[in-house]
Amino acid sequence: MEGKPRVKVVLLDIEGTVCPISFVKDILFPYALAALPETLSTQWDSPSFLPYRSAFPPEHASTPDALLSHVRDLMAQDLKIPYLKSLQGYLWLRGYESGELKCPLFPDVYPALKKWRDNGAKICIYSSGSVAAQKLLWRYTTEGDLRSCIWNGLEGDDGRELEGGYWDTVNAGLKQHMASYEKIAKANSALGEVGEWLFLSDNIKEVRAAREAGMKSFVVVREGNAEVTAEEREGQVLVESFAEVEKWVEVTADKA
């Protein structure tokens, strides 16, 4: 492995990278839509639901019907609005806890995460899904509860928890913006320089943004993902499995 660049932090996309796009599009999204009417009927005024309802624009949160109509419209357009993503996470909770929902990881994901973690590298997540939804997904996978694989932050000298390993469009910004990756790396600068980060995603525009920020970044090619054109492939590293990552870099960190 001599001569390969070293990576201390691996930043992972979720949909189309660690699990099939179909799990999100064909299972999670329909589940949320199906669960929403009953939730609105039984929990509209409940303290637990109020924060999610209040996050919606007032004109769309005046009645259960107005909120339901707005959610259907947003999801039909596949818009990644933070208040929608937060609500979806809330709706998925019951499905995960009941066993109806379980994230089907690609078979190469868990072995790679375990190896990288055991080598001292830190693993972080960056997804358009809310941080709460990300934690649910990693808790309920086909490989069991894998939250221990994800870096969960440090404590400062005053005991205050510093920025951790889960990032979304609220605490980081939009995924196709260079500044979002700069923010993530800066917030976790204790883990390594930005050039020691590797971002893995199926989205070419996200990969380019991460590279512009100074990170290493590879395009993950999976069955069911959009085809990567010849033009898009130019200048990019493509991997079809996490097992291929270490053909290009050494994922490890100094150990005490």
UniProtKB/Swiss-Prot annotation:
EC code: 3.1.3.77
A Gene Ontology term for the protein's cellular component: nucleus
SUPFAM superfamilies, alphabetized: HAD-like
CDD domains xref list: HAD_EP
Biological processes annotated in GO: L-methionine salvage from methylthioadenosine
Binding site for substrate: 127-128, 175
A molecular function GO annotation: magnesium ion binding
Record pathway: Amino-acid biosynthesis; L-methionine biosynthesis via salvage pathway; L-methionine from S-methyl-5-thio-alpha-D-ribose 1-phosphate: step 3/6; Amino-acid biosynthesis; L-methionine biosynthesis via salvage pathway; L-methionine from S-methyl-5-thio-alpha-D-ribose 1-phosphate: step 4/6
Binding site for Mg(2+): 13, 15, 202
Keywords (A to Z) from UniProt: Amino-acid biosynthesis, Cytoplasm, Hydrolase, Magnesium, Metal-binding, Methionine biosynthesis, Nucleus
InterPro entries for the chain: Enolase-ppase_E1, ENOPH1_eukaryotes, HAD-like_sf, HAD_sf
UniProt-listed Gene3D superfamilies: 1.10.720.60, HAD superfamily/HAD-like
Disulphide-bonded residues: none
Main enzyme class: hydrolase
Stated role: Bifunctional enzyme that catalyzes the enolization of 2,3-diketo-5-methylthiopentyl-1-phosphate (DK-MTP-1-P) into the intermediate 2-hydroxy-3-keto-5-methylthiopentenyl-1-phosphate (HK-MTPenyl-1-P), which is then dephosphorylated to form the acireductone 1,2-dihydroxy-3-keto-5-methylthiopentene (DHK-MTPene).
PANTHER family: ENOLASE-PHOSPHATASE E1
Subunit-level organization: Monomer.
HAMAP family hit by this protein: Salvage_MtnC_euk
Protein name, UniProt field: Enolase-phosphatase E1
Lineage of producing organism: Eukaryota, Fungi, Dikarya, Ascomycota, Pezizomycotina
